[in-house]
A protein has these predicted regions:
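Extended beta-strand/beta-hairpin segments
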Residues: 1-62, 69-148
Length: 148
């Protein structure tokens, strides 16, 4: 069985712990997205448009950085390392157009002030293996995760 087949089998056997549900209409140019529980209710617009709204790249950056910071916490607890009170992640997601197609790239710039650099880097490396967004993007888009 290949690694892909093993991963798929694990996913099929895994317990669903949460399902996010949203309804989107109008697309990225003049749309809106709302979650089924009402906690997310956003207008969508193109970057730089007159209309106020967010876009899929901003939502992806926010989701990934929040998830990655939580994964750092999981890694820290596993290693019994106290995290600083003010960890932060600046996420950048680029939308590219090349050869008639769109694709993404991303950078996560992680700040863990007060931790030794080698300890912080070990946490980032482990978090990258834990975070579902990192797993989903691995091998699909160019990603740089950097300790700043």
């Amino acid at each position: 069985m290949s690694q892909v087949e093993r991963d798929h089998a694990t996913l099929q056997a895994g317990k669903v712990v949460y399902t996010a549900k949203t309804h989107t209409s109008g697309g990225r140019e003049n749309g809106a997205s709302r979650s089924s529980d009402g906690r997310l209710d956003v207008q969508l617009s193109l970057p730089g448009a007159v209309r106020i709204g967010t876009n899929p790249e901003q939502l992806f950056a926010a989701g990934w950085s929040a998830c990655f910071e939580s994964a750092i916490g999981v890694a820290a607890r596993k290693r019994r390392i106290a995290l600083p009170a003010d960890p932060a992640i600046d996420a950048e997601v680029d939308l590219h157009l090349a050869d008639g197609g769109y694709f993404l790239s991303a950078r996560l710039n992680v700040s863990l002030p007060g931790l030794a650099r080698d300890v912080a880097q070990a946490l980032l490396d482990e978090a990258d293996q834990i975070c579902p967004y990192s797993k989903a993007s691995r091998g699909n888009i160019d990603v740089a995760i950097k300790l700043v």
